Amino acid sequence: MKNVLITGAAGFIGSNFVRYELEKHADWNIVVYDKLTYAGNLDNLKDVAEKFGGRYRFMQGDIADREAVFGCVKDNGIDLIINFAADSHVDRSLTEPGSFIMTDVYGTYVLLEAAREFNIARFHQISTDEVYGDIEAPGRSTEEDKLHGSSPYSASKAGGDLMCLAYARSFNVPVTITRGTNNIGPFQYPEKVVPVWVTNAIDGLPLPMYGDGRQMRDYQYVLDHCEGIDVVIEKGALGEVYNIGSGIETRNIDLAHAILDLLGKPYSLIQTITDRPGHDRRYAIDNSKARELGWQPGHTFAQALEKTVRWYLENESWWRKIKSGEYLAYYKKQYAGREI
């Protein structure tokens, strides 16, 4: 059996990844280590605990807590560390940059120290295409491009990536990194654009859109991303970075239209608001390096979005529980008074 530590896996992508891996790898025992911040939710893993209880364990903790991390790795005989733990919302990074640095840079350092101390067989870092910054068409960011994080979030993730590569070179820690594009799918906390717009549209509420809505993003289905990560962990070369994304670019305005069309709602629900400071106009990656390992995306944009919208329609109790209390206060603070 392989003992795997997956940090931050009570969140969106991590919880989907845990489910994917337990179904695929009968020889994996998984320890989920999560701080359970506002976006961490054990409801995301409820079915996992019920179905895979013998091979799944949850521990609450902060990756920046060296003593707790080292104890977790040692006590569970960890062979593989996969780091999903991150503060990940750009808007929050503009008001709380310190927490992003603590988790995304210092927390990554602590995990790397644990990997070094206990001779972990593989350390895999989950990163983002946002570390490249925006890129003019028709260019696409490759793994060799310089990092130009333009928000505290992307800068902190870039710092974590560089720390991983430094540990690979300086201390021979067996590191791989994947940089994923925007994910959509089940269990995404409704502060990100797709679940915000889908759940608002279901209730007939405005869809807040930054600026002219012509920002370009690559949206991929979360399980395609999970498969890509798995392939890189199994086949990727140590010390290397791999971009994971659909390769399909979509403007935010077109995303809003597609969501409203799927729900049969009017375009008049789109509400233009003042743009985000330093908002990147276009992200686009070259995913050919991951494809060379045998991975390829399994969903078109239309398929991914339809599955996502259907999931939120069928799981209202999940997101309605979240869209109350602290969330309402955050939403009002983020969007109130910004209408154009």
Where on the chain are the PLM-derived regions?
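Short beta-loop-alpha junction of Rossmann-like oxidoreductase domains
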Residues: 134-136, 186-188, 192, 289
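The catalytic Tyr-centered alpha-helix of NAD(P)H-dependent dehydrogenases
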Residues: 149-156, 186, 190-194, 218-222
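N-terminal Rossmann-like NAD(P)+-binding domain of SDR-like oxidoreductases, especially those catalyzing
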Residues: 1-183, 307, 315, 321-340
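Short, conserved catalytic or interaction motifs in soluble domains
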Residues: 41, 186, 246
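Hydrophobic alpha-helix immediately C-terminal to the catalytic Tyr-X-X-X-Lys motif of short-chain
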Residues: 159, 163, 167, 197, ...
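A glycine/serine/threonine-rich, flexible loop-to-helix segment
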Residues: 48, 139, 190-198
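C-terminal substrate-binding subdomain of Rossmann-fold SDR/epimerase-dehydratase oxidoreductases
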Residues: 61, 195, 201-340
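Loop/helix-junction capping segments adjacent to catalytic residues or to phosphate/diphosphate-binding pockets
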Residues: 39, 66, 187, 191, ...
